[in-house]
């Protein structure tokens, strides 16, 4: 490190590669096209490139063990031996086959050891998956039970540290801290507290720390983002207990404790009292922490200042940051300061320079992972007194000014519409009880009506046609004809298997958010701006930079064509305003609530156009509602108020005869059920198959009045559930809700699955519903 620079650290970087090389390797391995050895070689290549890239950009504290073939929490479960018996691991080492069975489920084959403990001949399900704090990344939920034993079953952190060292990189290994790991998990015993396992877990971490120290590691990064949550005294005491034991029984290795995604709040004193050598704080989400740690922090504590936004794509105003940070760094002392992103850069794309199709002005406002590391290096130099970065500072300030004053940002007509929103636009004209009677008469559906969430498999043929159309190799007329053939085929097949409410399959859509945002003013789009959602699943979030306008109808003609092919109800499919917001990179110059209301007005226009075209069922997906929930309960009400308000603005312009559906996934509803009910959707479908219908307990306790489609088919796994398996889930749902409330559907859309998986699974689902109808009280048929 230059004497005219502060240390620059990253907490983690994107794993997928600049062009999604990890996705290609994983899917090739799962398809049997490459060997396990080749997969490991490809993964090593990505790690080596990441380390080299960081060093070349001026990062001086480089992480290792931030890479994962699927998920870092799953890696931790495997590392400590937290592997459910159903996956048949031997407790000493874990095969890649078992690892992926935990992640994806498994269809039993001759070589599938995990099937040895399967209660079904058809394989094992994947572990439950949920959102990582309030991000769009997913982790595999650890499973804990009373008396659980832990042991070091994977040396991955040591192996990757040694890999880096052999290449000449001195790294800081990254570990998920034991308290966060236990708090992220679940137990089937509701009375059991996973934190009670802490003393059994700590020795595994201590063994690992000794191994790392023996191999030359001087620092280790413990991620404890649970520190930004509402913690009780038991959790705070657990943190104190764990890190005191590390200090007492561990090696002389320095610990950088990383918190991120929010303020430490009432956990700050706990964090500052831990026997650690460094503390990372998120100064993007919690800028007030800077003054607090300057005033209250220990004089021997290295402070890692998370000053560059690791979760959004906007370029920083470096002169403004310099002005803000300089006095605080002077008080702390340069020897006690590291500069870092607010969190891991896992949540942003790799490199904006790969984008050749963005407007030059919009591109100049952006910073992806590579650019953020470069910004940190420049900021580190200027704060250390380097006078040779004046041009870089001027360019940064110029970009910030250009963005702030650009005519692309503000639209006067949008401002007029926003001021015109009144209470009549925020609610349905009639209560649900009356609407449901009208809709029941209109549709005449059987008990346990069957439907899907919207999308069908995006086959190679569909993707190739879309790509050919995008590059001009397929004309608009040819592409339109191709899509109509796909829709017609899907409609015929749905009728053949007996689904009650049909969908058109969404073959024209690249992504449920991108498809809509591409047809709304105020958005920009990337070609290589991918971020990891889970495993090989990558998403390319739109960039919402300005006021939102819908120039023309988006879905009406596709719905009209699909409905013309059948006499059964055809759901129109939309993505809701809250989900578009939460799955986009959003402008940071106005409140998110205001941005969301702009989106709600645009989608309200689409809903009304669909109804005018004849659509009787309109689904407005709010899959991402819960992930926008603030991490601190005290902030929940404000978010839920404006999020629900935006959904109702979007959905309430229709008549009583029109049935509004919504879909939510990866959600826990116990603590927000009142807000869900206030959205007043006629039908809500939710993901419940992995949780064995546990999520429905919230609806039962609340006496939720509207209709619900609990998912009976886990679409995140390739395995095909049997009819009896889905019947069991429906029976569980019937113990929690009235039969008249229940719909039968998969957990989520089927875009990422294959037809050979979808066809038998949906046929089994329809059979399950029909068998239950036949066996039920005739009055509900």
Curated annotation (Swiss-Prot):
UniProt: 5-methyltetrahydropteroyltri-L-glutamate binding residues: 20-23, 131, 537-538, 583, 627
Positions of L-methionine binding: 453-455, 506, 621
Note accompanying the cofactor annotation: Binds 1 zinc ion per subunit.
Family annotation (InterPro entries): Cbl-indep_Met_Synth_N, Cobalamin-indep_Met_synthase, Met_Synth_C/arc, UROD/MetE-like_sf
EC nos: 2.1.1.14
Active site residues of this protein: 716 (proton donor)
Cofactor: Zn(2+)
SUPFAM superfamilies named in the record: UROD/MetE-like (SSF51726)
Keyword terms of this UniProt record: Amino-acid biosynthesis, Metal-binding, Methionine biosynthesis, Methyltransferase, Repeat, Transferase, Zinc
MF terms (GO), sorted A to Z: 5-methyltetrahydropteroyltriglutamate-homocysteine S-methyltransferase activity; zinc ion binding
Entry's Gene Ontology BP terms: methionine biosynthetic process; methylation
Source organism, top-level taxon: Bacteria
Protein name: 5-methyltetrahydropteroyltriglutamate--homocysteine methyltransferase
């Amino acid at each position: 490190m230059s004497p005219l620079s502060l240390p620059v650290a990253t907490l983690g970087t994107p794993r997928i590669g600049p062009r999604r090389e990890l996705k290609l390797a994983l899917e090739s391995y799962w398809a049997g096209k490459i060997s396990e050895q080749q997969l490991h070689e490809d993964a090593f290549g990505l790690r080596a490139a990441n380390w080299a890239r960081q060093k070349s950009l001026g990062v001086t504290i480089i992480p290792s063990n931030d890479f994962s073939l699927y998920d870092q929490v799953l890696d931790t479960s495997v590392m400590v031996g937290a592997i459910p018996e159903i996956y048949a691991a031997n407790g000493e080492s874990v095969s890649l086959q078992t690892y992926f069975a935990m992640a994806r489920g498994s269809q039993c084959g001759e070589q599938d050891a995990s099937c040895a403990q399967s209660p079904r001949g058809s394989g094992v399900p994947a572990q439950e998956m949920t959102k990582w704090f309030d991000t769009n990344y997913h982790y595999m939920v650890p499973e804990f039970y009373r008396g659980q034993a832990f042991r070091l079953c994977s040396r991955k952190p040591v192996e990757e540290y040694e890999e880096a060292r052999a290449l000449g990189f001195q790294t800081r290994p990254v570990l998920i801290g034991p308290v966060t790991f236990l708090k992220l998990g679940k137990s089937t015993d509701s009375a059991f507290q996973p934190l009670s396992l802490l003393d059994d877990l700590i020795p595994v971490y201590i063994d690992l720390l000794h191994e790392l120290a023996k191999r030359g590691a001087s620092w280790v990064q413990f991620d404890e983002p649970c520190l930004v949550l509402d913690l009780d005294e038991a959790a705070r005491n657990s943190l104190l207990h764990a890190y005191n034991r590390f200090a007492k029984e561990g090696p002389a290795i320095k610990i950088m404790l990383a918190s991120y995604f929010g303020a430490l709040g009432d956990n700050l004193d706990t964090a500052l009292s831990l026997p650690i050598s460094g503390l990372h704080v998120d100064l993007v989400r919690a800028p007030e922490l800077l003054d607090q740690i300057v005033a209250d922090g220990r004089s021997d504590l290295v402070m890692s200042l998370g000053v560059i936004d690791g979760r959004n794509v906007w370029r920083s105003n470096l002169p403004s940051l310099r002005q803000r940070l300089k006095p605080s760094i002077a008080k702390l002392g340069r020897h006690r300061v590291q500069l870092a992103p607010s969190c891991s850069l896992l949540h942003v794309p790799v490199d904006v320079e790969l984008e050749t199709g963005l407007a030059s002005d919009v591109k100049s406002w952006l910073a992806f992972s590579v650019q953020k590391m470069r910004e940190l290096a420049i900021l580190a130099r200027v704060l250390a007194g380097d006078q040779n970065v004046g041009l870089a500072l001027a360019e940064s300030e110029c970009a910030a000014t250009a963005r702030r004053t650009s005519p692309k940002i503000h639209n006067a007509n949008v401002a007029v519409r926003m001021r015109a929103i009144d209470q009549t636009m925020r609610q349905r004209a009639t209560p649900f009880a009356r609407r449901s009677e009208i809709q029941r008469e209109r549709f005449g559906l059987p008990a346990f009506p069957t439907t899907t969430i919207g999308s069908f498999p995006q086959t190679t043929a569909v993707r190739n046609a879309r790509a050919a159309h995008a590059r001009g190799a397929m004309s608009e007329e040819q592409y339109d004809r191709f899509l109509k053939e796909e829709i017609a085929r899907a409609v015929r097949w749905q009728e053949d298997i007996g689904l009650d409410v049909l969908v058109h399959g969404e073959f024209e859509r690249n992504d449920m958010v991108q498809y809509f945002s591409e047809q709304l003013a105020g958005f920009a789009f990337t070609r290589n701006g991918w971020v990891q959602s889970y495993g090989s699943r990558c998403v390319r979030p739109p960039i919402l930079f300005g006021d939102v306008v819908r120039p023309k109808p988006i879905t009406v003609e596709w719905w009209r064509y699909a409905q013309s092919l059948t006499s059964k109800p055809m759901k129109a499919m939309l993505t809701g305003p809250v989900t578009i917001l939460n799955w986009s990179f959003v402008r940071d110059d106005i409140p998110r609530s205001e941005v969301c209301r702009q989106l709600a007005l645009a989608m309200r226009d689409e809903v009304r156009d669909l109804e005018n075209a004849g659509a009787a069922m309109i689904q407005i997906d709010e899959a991402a509602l819960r992930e926008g929930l603030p991490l601190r309960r005290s902030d929940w009400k404000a978010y839920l108020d404006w999020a629900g308000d935006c959904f109702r603005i979007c959905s309430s312009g229709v008549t009583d005869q029109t049935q509004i559906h919504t879909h939510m996934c990866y959600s826990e509803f116990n603590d927000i059920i009142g807000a869900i009910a206030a959205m007043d959707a006629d039908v809500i479908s939710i993901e419940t198959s992995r949780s064995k219908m546990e999520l429905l307990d919230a609806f039962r306790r609340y006496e939720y009045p509207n209709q619900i489609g609990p998912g009976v088919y886990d679409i995140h796994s390739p395995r095909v559930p049997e009819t009896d398996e889905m019947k069991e889930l429906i029976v569980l749902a019937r113990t929690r809700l009235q039969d008249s409330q229940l719909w039968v559907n998969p957990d989520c859309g089927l875009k990422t699955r294959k037809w050979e998986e979808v066809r038998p699974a949906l046929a089994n689902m329809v059979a399950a519903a029909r068998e239950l109808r036949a066996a039920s009280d005739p009055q509900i048929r």
